């Protein structure tokens, strides 16, 4: 029985880490009511200098509401996955994603727990929920959803828990644009089509150790916060590319880089800005709290891997 409890607790921990990485990659921006399918040539952004254009995109991003997202993420041998759904960012990250693991140790952990490698995730301002299917529910008293409180993650995970909490709560859509502005060497690559949408392509590489206020296009406070976030996540270098349509809306973002645990890359597509984002939480009767699972498994606050 204790072995079973430890196994399901370990699986829940793996999912907790995986869902935070999803959040870190789930950026988008747009104006409510736009479907992101711009027509004709990419407009205002393409006519401005790269820095001025991206600041305009960042401003729009900060005031956007929601979008549909679709993408893939690879993090060395740890995991490879694809995700799709709808996210909102009016007040922190919210939304619902379907995440399917296509490889890596985390995908293996889910399958060993009896799952099919897919997770339903729902994000809210102070917490998120994960549904790993009937097989996991069989080990949690028939309850399908695991609730993760960001506060609990910080308290229970020590330093790594703080990183998890920070990654989700600060995974605002403009992070990709902010990374380009921080790089100090952002370049306009040219005009390209993204799934039939004419767009302007921008690219830049961030060297975390070399970031200084002198070569960055962020102010000192923004730069310090951004460097801290990347350092906590173990990111040493990061190349970011974004594609922006004529309405100054992201239609695609890619990130490639090196972390302390290996290389990573992600590709995200955005569409249907202003889409409705699910706001209903799973039923309490079908939910088990992650903190309670840790207690049953004998885990202690501050224990990190």
Swiss-Prot record:
InterPro entries: LolA/LolB/LppX (IPR029046). This is Uncharacterized 31.2 kDa protein in rplA-rplJ intergenic region. The lineage of its organism: Bacteria, Bacillati, Actinomycetota, Actinomycetes, Kitasatosporales.
């Amino acid at each position: 029985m204790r072995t079973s409890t430890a196994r399901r607790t370990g699986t829940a921990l793996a999912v907790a880490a995986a869902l935070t990485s999803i959040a870190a990659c789930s950026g988008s921006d747009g104006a409510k009511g736009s479907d992101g399918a711009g027509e004709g040539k990419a407009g205002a952004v393409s006519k401005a200098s790269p820095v001025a254009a991206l600041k305009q995109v960042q401003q729009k991003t900060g005031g956007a509401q929601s979008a549909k997202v679709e993408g893939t993420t690879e993090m060395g041998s740890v995991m490879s996955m694809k995700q799709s759904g709808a996210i909102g960012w009016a007040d922190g990250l919210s939304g619902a994603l379907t995440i399917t693991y296509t490889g890596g140790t985390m995908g293996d952990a889910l399958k060993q727990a009896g799952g099919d490698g897919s997770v339903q995730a729902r994000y809210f301002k102070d917490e998120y929920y994960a549904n790993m299917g009937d097989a996991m529910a069989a080990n949690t008293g028939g309850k399908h959803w695991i609730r993760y409180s960001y506060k609990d993650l910080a308290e229970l995970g020590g330093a790594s828990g703080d990183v998890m909490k920070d990654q989700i709560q600060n995974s605002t859509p403009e992070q990709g644009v902010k990374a380009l502005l921080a790089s100090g060497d952002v370049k306009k690559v040219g005009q390209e089509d993204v799934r039939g949408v004419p767009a302007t392509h921008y690219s830049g590489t961030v060297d975390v150790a070399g970031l200084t206020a002198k070569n960055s296009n962020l102010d000192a406070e923004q730069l310090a916060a951004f460097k801290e976030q990347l350092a906590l996540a173990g990111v040493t270098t990061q190349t970011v590319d974004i594609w922006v349509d004529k309405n100054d809306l992201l239609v695609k973002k890619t990130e490639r880089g090196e972390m302390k645990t290996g290389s990573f890359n992600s590709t995200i597509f955005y569409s249907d800005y202003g889409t409705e984002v699910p706001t209903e939480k799973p039923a309490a009767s079908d939910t088990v709290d992650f903190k309670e699972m840790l207690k049953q498994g004998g885990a202690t606050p501050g224990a990190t891997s």
